[in-house]
Amino acid sequence: MPHQQMLILFGLLPVATNISTWWNFGSMLLTCSALQVMTGFSLSMHYTANINLAFCSIIHITRDVPHGWVMQNLHAIGASMFFICIYMYIARGLYYGSYLNKETWLSGTTLLIMLMATAFFGYVLPWGQMSFWAATVITNLLTAIPYLGTTMTTWLWGGFAINDPTLTRFFALHFILPFGIISVSSIHIMLLHEDGSGNPLGTNSDIDKIPFHPYHTYKDILMISIMIITLLLTVSFFPDIMNDPENFSKANPLVTPQHIKPEWYFLFAYGILRSIPNKLGGALALVMSIMILFTMPFTHTSPMRSLTFRPLMQFMFWTLVATFVIITWTATKPVEPPFTTISQVASIIYFTFFMSNPILGWLENKITKHN
């Protein structure tokens, strides 16, 4: 009887008995989101969106504001933790066929794009050397768009170069986008619980479900605790581990850093961009590296949902993971051989995974029917 009442109370949350730890990342992302909003709100009270004062305001926060250094480092390292969780969440979705819940997957991919935009705007705000030059390089890609590119870039910058209006609007966007993320997250969660989550076997779990609370609540609390402990240990002992040394210097438009690169969580897309020696081609590849996730629900041809019983796609999946790491690594290196060649080969393999999905599904059908 208590279990029935609990199921009624959490009526939208009957969950498969066999979901593993890979299903805990949703609650971890929700925790990250709440942490980022709270620390970001605290930081915004002391931040000044002005090119002459932004860098000084960050120093003021870390030195003079009570516990400001904790807030600043929690926000910066929390962003990295957010992306670690979201990349693992996407990897789980690809492996276990979560993309077959079309609406949930499409809303989730939209969330990823919004999150990347928010993180990019946030990276510019300290107005350090790497912040300024990363913003210059990435926003300048808009000029590759035929006819409209130059006008769009001037509109985004608020002038003919990155200046005070650019920083002001980036701060405004960085502040407002998280509220959009929260709204789309709510839609994402509602869509997810309309169909119900999958399970490692990729089978229908309607006949074997248990209430979310208390069984999965404790699993979630355990993983959230591990994440928060890791975050606090990093903030306490290695607060600058994710920072670029160039960003400890104030932005100087007259001095170009030897090697311009964005934060680590954008390096895979940046590596794909750099691997193509053409501005428009590189910009298209950069956009497609994310947008190609939208195609997954429409290119699935296998009768099996999960990769658990699909060895060919399993091989391609782990190749994709290795490729992701390799592109991230090559993007930190100078644009010279052998790094350019490695990056180009890895980029081709990255897109091959998504293109091979329907072909390997069809091939597996043939092999299964033949046997």
Swiss-Prot record:
Q: Its topology with respect to the membrane?
A: Multi-pass membrane protein
One Gene Ontology cellular component annotation held by this UniProt entry: mitochondrial inner membrane
Q: Which CDD domains match?
A: cytochrome_b_C (cd00290), Cytochrome_b_N (cd00284)
Superkingdom of the organism of origin = Eukaryota
Q: Which InterPro entries match?
A: Cyt_b/b6_C, Cyt_b/b6_C_sf, Cyt_b/b6_N, Cytb/b6-like_sf, Cytochrome_b, Cytochrome_b_C_euk/bac, Cytochrome_b_N_euk/bac, Di-haem_cyt_TM
Listed cofactors: heme b
PROSITE patterns (UniProt xref): CYTB_CTER, CYTB_NTER
Any Gene Ontology biological process: mitochondrial electron transport, ubiquinol to cytochrome c
- Disulfide pairs here are none
The entry assigns this protein to a family as follows:
Belongs to the cytochrome b family.
Query: What name has this protein been given in UniProt?
Result: Cytochrome b
Q: Which organism is it from?
A: Candoia aspera
Gene, per the UniProt record: MT-CYB
